Amino acid sequence: MAEDEIWTEKYRPRRLEDVIGHQQITRRLISYVKSGNLPHLLFSGPPGVGKTACAVALARELYGETWHSNFIELNASDERGIDVVRNNIKNFARTAPLGEAKFKIIFLDEADALTSDAQSALRRTMERYAATCRFIISCNYSSKIIEPIQSRCAVYRFGPLNATDITTGITRIAKNEGLKIEKDGMDALIYVARGDMRRAINALQSAATIAKDITADVIYQTTSTAKPKEIEDMLKLALNGQFMDSRNKLDELLITYGLSGTDIIDQIYRSMFELGLDEDVLVALVDRIGEADFRLTEGASERIQIEALLAHFKMQGAARSK
Ligand SMILES: Nc1ncnc2c1ncn2[C@@H]1O[C@H](COP(=O)(O)OP(=O)(O)OP(=O)(O)O)[C@@H](O)[C@H]1O
């Protein structure tokens, strides 16, 4: 294998039993393989948790050697438009499946990026080729998929992977690549991954370019993530009434790590539960974080939103000490 190969590809599960986590889903997919038939499928869930990996492993097991000819992966949100996607489907569906197979599989990634009109066009395409093709539609949010498509599919919801799953995946790769992962290094990988195995593997590969001994410092440095402790320190300063100091800490984090506003908000959200705050204080702060998060997606100033959030930490801290 090439030295510079991307590890997420190199370690893509070949078989359904190699997929980590999602046992209930893989069990049912294996039963499709055994029966030699499957309905249209809708895979929904966050990025990097194994939706594509499951679809490819399913095709490999179903078709064996001929899987490449009987499986196509298309990006539904192809920027050239839904007509290009439909043309690709048409060309692929035109020829009969190879080998023993009764149907071909069309894997459509990012279907939730399609407008409702484009999804309606897709639905008609699904119907037209239903005799010779099965569709596996992948999306982050099933609520963004129109009802007529959802009702034609068996829906599988992929959740984020838990810490044990990430540890299993990372340990497997580290062993093969001759890396030593320190306990704090693994904790950092789990923190950075946020349930996304792709993110964990990419973080490991970047870290491996600078060290064979993977520590938390290496992970935070190579992924431009602030250490949870630094975020906690910033929040504690605000809670203790030292608003200007917490603001300086924010500056330091922005400069050191080049964090985006949404990165910091996400980290603040995760750190605040470690501060031993009363439930009613947490409730008030979570409410504010939700607000700031929404405003950022609407294009508000990152700097002002985060400072406003720190101001709320200060106000809650002051109310708490009364
Ligand atoms: N459950 C898993 N078990 C083992 N490896 C995994 C798992 N999930 C992800 N990976 C690794 O991460 C890579 C990316 O995963 P995959 O392409 O399946 O994500 P996805 O859920 O389809 O994401 P997206 O929504 O972004 O397309 C895989 O090639 C594999 O290396």
Swiss-Prot record:
Biological processes annotated in GO: DNA repair; DNA-templated DNA replication
Swiss-Prot/TrEMBL keywords: ATP-binding, DNA replication, Nucleotide-binding
Residues that hold ATP according to the record: 45-52
Keyword Nucleotide-binding appears in the UniProt entry: yes
Molecular-function GO term, any one: DNA clamp loader activity
Matches recorded under Pfam families: AAA, AAA_lid_RFC1, Rep_fac_C
GO cellular component terms, semicolon-separated: DNA replication factor C complex
Cystine residue pairs: none
CDD domains: AAA, HLD_clamp_RFC
Coiled coil: none
Classification via InterPro entries: AAA+_ATPase, ATPase_AAA_core, DNA_pol3_clamp-load_cplx_C, DNA_Rep/Repair_Clamp_Loader, P-loop_NTPase, Rep_factor-C_ssu_arc, Rep_factorC_C, RFC_lid
NCBIfam families listed in its UniProt record: PRK00440.1
Primary role: Part of the RFC clamp loader complex which loads the PCNA sliding clamp onto DNA.
UniProt similarity note: Belongs to the activator 1 small subunits family. RfcS subfamily.
Oligomer status and interactors: Heteromultimer composed of small subunits (RfcS) and large subunits (RfcL).
UniProt protein name: Replication factor C small subunit
